[in-house]
């Protein structure tokens, strides 16, 4: 018997970009309601400058891996509920 390796399906470049945005959005939604206020404000300040987006995303992923069972400490992580967004 010869076993065949599972075939990877072709991923269209537009789909790859969409998946990146969805993954970033999901990461933000999970962490923004769980991280302490100081960390959230630091991330928001870094995002305001615009060049630190990847660094913030990596820090969010690292925080998620270190604190997988972090409790929800704020009801929402949106711009209206977080004064650090400056909207």
Curated annotation (Swiss-Prot):
Domain of life: Viruses
One GO CC term on file: host cell nucleus
Chief location: virion
Compartments, record wording: Virion; Host nucleus
Keyword annotations: Cell cycle, Host nucleus, Virion
Reported function: Seems to function as a Vpr-like protein, since it mediates host cell cycle arrest in G2 phase. Cell cycle arrest creates a favorable environment for maximizing viral expression and production.
The protein, known as: Probable Vpr-like protein
Gene: tat
């Amino acid at each position: 018997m010869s076993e065949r390796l599972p075939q990877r399906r072709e991923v269209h470049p537009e789909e790859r970009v969409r998946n990146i945005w969805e993954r970033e959005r999901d990461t933000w939604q999970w962490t923004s309601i769980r991280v302490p206020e100081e960390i959230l404000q630091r991330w928001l300040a870094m995002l305001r400058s615009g060049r630190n987006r990847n660094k913030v995303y990596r820090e969010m992923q690292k925080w998620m891996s270190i604190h997988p069972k972090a409790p929800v400490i704020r009801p929402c992580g949106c711009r209206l509920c977080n004064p650090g967004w400056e909207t």
